[in-house]
Amino acid sequence: RRQRQMCIRDSPTGETFTHAELVTFLDAIPSNVLVTLDEAYYHYNRTEDFPRSLELLSSYPNLVVLRTFSKAYGLAGFRVGYFVGSEEACSNLSKTVIPFSTSLAAQAAARAALTIRDQLLARTDAIVAERERVTKELRAMGFQVDNSQANFVWLPRSDAQQLIDYLIQRKVIIRGFPGEGIRVTIATPEENTQFLNVIADYPAIRPEI
């Protein structure tokens, strides 16, 4: 059976698409093609027209939604997640899962994480607030910053390697894509401020588009 995979938030840019765009895409896919929708950054989306994927499962039995405990839940070391869909679609997807890939400890951690929704919301709200602050300050400096709905921001730069080297020399570690840009993970307010103070002194601060 054929499969198509989509990411709700593009990595490394963090940009997303609307509910209507998702429906248009699903309508264009044959019903015998399995569609897996990666929602790893689902909890960081604050757009009003974000894709409401779970509402579509009854209308699109070939759709499976994938989510992880590695991002918002903070369980990256456990490598645990889940998927939701029709019985047939989940059965087909299960055939690709490596046997015994999740430990008992990871399962216990995931179950416990599901019981602390208030803490999850507080944590993600804090990251979103910092994401908006970092984005605003970078743009005020003159950097181009894409509209991210994830826990990171993307700065497109033709001089990415030069900027990567500049930051590393000042002990600031980011994810670099030479010739394309840099992806900066939103951390604590103190760490974000340190990053902003360092990048503010970057000699070629004006973006090269």
Which residues does each PLM region occupy?
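Hydrophobic residues in well-ordered beta-strands that form the structural core
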Residues: L37, V65, T102, I174-G176
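PLP-dependent aminotransferase class I/II
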Residues: N62-R139, F143-D146
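Short, small-residue-biased leader/transition segments that mark boundaries at the very start
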Residues: Q3-I8
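Active-site pre-lysine segment of PLP-dependent enzymes
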Residues: P12-V35, E39-S70
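Short amphipathic alpha-helix with an adjacent loop that forms part of the alpha/beta core around
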Residues: R1-R2, D27, E55, Y202
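PLP-dependent enzyme catalytic core of the Aspartate aminotransferase-like
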Residues: A20, Q161, Y166-R170, R175-I209
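Conserved PLP-binding catalytic core of the aspartate aminotransferase-like
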Residues: I127-V128, E132, K136-R170, I186
